[in-house]
A protein has these predicted regions:
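ASCE P-loop NTPase helicase motor core
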Residues: 1-161
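Conserved helicase motor core of P-loop NTPases
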Residues: 78, 86-93, 101-253
C-alpha cells in the first residue's frame, strides 16, 4: 500500500507512527510540466500501481474545490477529484480515507467532503465507513479527553451556540483571568520549555496578537528578526532542485 497525507507535516507524522514511508498527495499524483509562454504547471499523473491500497491520513483537510488544498496550479484545481481519478486509474486499486469529522473543514467548506459517504458515492464508488471510538492516546480520566468527548457529542447532536466548558482550578482544564496569563506562560516556559507550550486561539489575527505579545513581553525581543528566533516555512516550493543543500517542508521550523 502507499501512505499519503495532504501536507508534508502530516505525512511525516503518518510515517513516524506507521513505520512506513508516507508522502504528500501532491508529490504522488502530480507531475511537473513546462509550457512555453505559460510557465510551469503540474498535471495529473497516471497510477501505474496494480491492486494497491492508498491510505490517506488527515483526509478532513482535503478540499473539493479550488482554494485551500485545491490549487489551479495543480491538475484540475480540485484535489479530491484528482486524487480519486488518480487512484482508480490504476488496476484494482482502492482508497482508504482516514480523518476526524470534528476537526475544522477546509477553507470555504462547511464540512469535510472527503469524509462524507454521499459525496464519495457521487463518484460512482462503493463506499463503506466506520467510526473509531476507542481513545488510545490519552488516559480515560483525562479532563482534556472529557471536554473533547462532550464537544464531539454536542456536534453529533446538532448543537448550535457556545458549548459549555467544564473547568477545575486544580485540574487540567482551568479558567485563567487575562491578567494572570503572562505569569502563567512564563512559569510554563520555565517548567516545560518553549517547544512544549502551545497557545491556541480562534483566529490567525488573534494568534498574531498573542505571538507578538509573547515575543516582546516574555522573550524581550523587539526587532523583526533576532538570534534564536524560530522560523517556519509556510509555503512549499515545488521548484526545488537538488542543488539546494537542505529543504524544509511546509509548517517545518528551522
Amino acid at each position: 500500500y502507499r501512505g499519503l497525507a495532504p501536507t508534508g507535516r502530516a505525512a511525516k507524522v503518518f510515517s513516524h507512527h506507521a513505520g512506513v514511508p508516507a508522502y504528500t498527495i501532491h508529490r504522488i499524483i502530480y507531475r511537473q510540466q513546462t509550457f512555453q509562454g505559460e510557465g510551469t504547471r503540474f498535471s495529473l499523473g497516471f497510477n501505474k500501481l496494480r491492486h494497491a491500497l492508498f491510505v490517506v491520513d488527515e483526509a478532513s483537510m482535503i478540499s473539493s474545490g479550488v482554494g485551500s488544498m485545491g490549487d489551479s496550479l495543480f491538475g484540475t484545481g480540485e484535489l479530491m477529484d484528482d486524487l480519486i481519478r488518480y487512484v482508480y486509474s490504476g488496476e484494482g486499486c482502492r482508497l482508504l480515507l482516514v480523518g476526524d469529522t470534528a476537526q475544522l473543514p477546509p477553507v470555504g467548506e462547511e464540512d469535510s467532503p472527503a469524509l462524507r459517504n454521499d459525496v464519495l458515492q457521487r463518484y460512482g464508488l462503493l463506499v463503506g465507513s466506520a467510526d473509531l471510538t476507542e481513545v488510545v492516546r490519552q488516559s480515560s480520566e483525562s479532563d482534556v479527553l472529557s471536554g473533547a468527548t462532550l464537544l464531539r457529542n454536542l456536534l453529533n447532536e446538532g448543537f448550535e451556540g457556545i458549548p459549555p466548558i467544564h473547568t477545575d482550578p486544580k485540574g487540567e482544564v482551568r479558567a485563567l483571568p487575562g491578567n494572570e496569563l503572562i505569569e502563567s506562560l512564563v512559569s510554563d516556559y520555565q517548567s516545560f520549555g518553549a517547544d512544549n507550550v502551545i497557545v491556541v486561539t480562534r483566529s490567525n489575527k488573534r494568534a498574531n496578537i498573542y505571538n507578538n505579545g509573547i515575543r516582546s513581553r516574555i522573550f524581550d525581543r523587539e526587532e523583526e528578526l533576532t538570534r534564536n528566533d524560530l522560523i517556519m516555512a509556510v509555503k512549499n516550493n515545488y521548484f526545488w532542485t537538488a542543488e539546494c543543500a537542505k529543504s524544509l517542508g511546509k509548517d517545518e521550523r528551522m
